[in-house]
Amino acid sequence: MILPIVAYGNPVLRKVARDIDENYPDLAKLIEDMWETMYASHGVGLAAPQVNKDIRLFVMDSAQIFANMDDEEKSEGNYPDAPGIKQVFINAHVVEEIGDDWAYNEGCLSIPKIREDIYRAEEVTVSYQDENFKHHTKTFDGVTARIILHEYDHIDGKLFIDKLSPLKRKLLRRKLDDISKGNISVDYKMVFPK
């Protein structure tokens, strides 16, 4: 089932999400719905707070980025994480961010039609559980690391716009206000703050 994406301005997006265990009700269905919602919304990642659940869960698929690149894009870039991954992250915690920060143009399903260059570390080591609650600690790099860090921010109550300068945020204020009021048209289901 495709779930509505929570829009900027909803308090759940600013809440630090809580850990869960294997007894969380209907978790398998929620994960399935999150995958369906993410793909229907043309996203590469989706965190539970974006579907109004304050839990430490996100899904991401960096493989689709590489699958959609043409040969010229592939030859021009340095993509150590190709061909990408498709993964569920439960109770994720960043262990370490490694390497120089690099800019990449990011957007967010909860903040539609706003894209900005955001600086993030080249690599990230994350401790997490998969959908079977098996523990992992892995290091990811490139675009995959970036998506993980973006989604991780969501479960920590942060948004990509928080990384912008105060001046840039001020320049975006009207657009952000429009999003929070529902004065925006998107091609996926959204729910706006009351």
Where are these regions (language model features)?
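Active-site rim/adjacent substrate-binding subdomains
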Residues: 1-149, 154-194
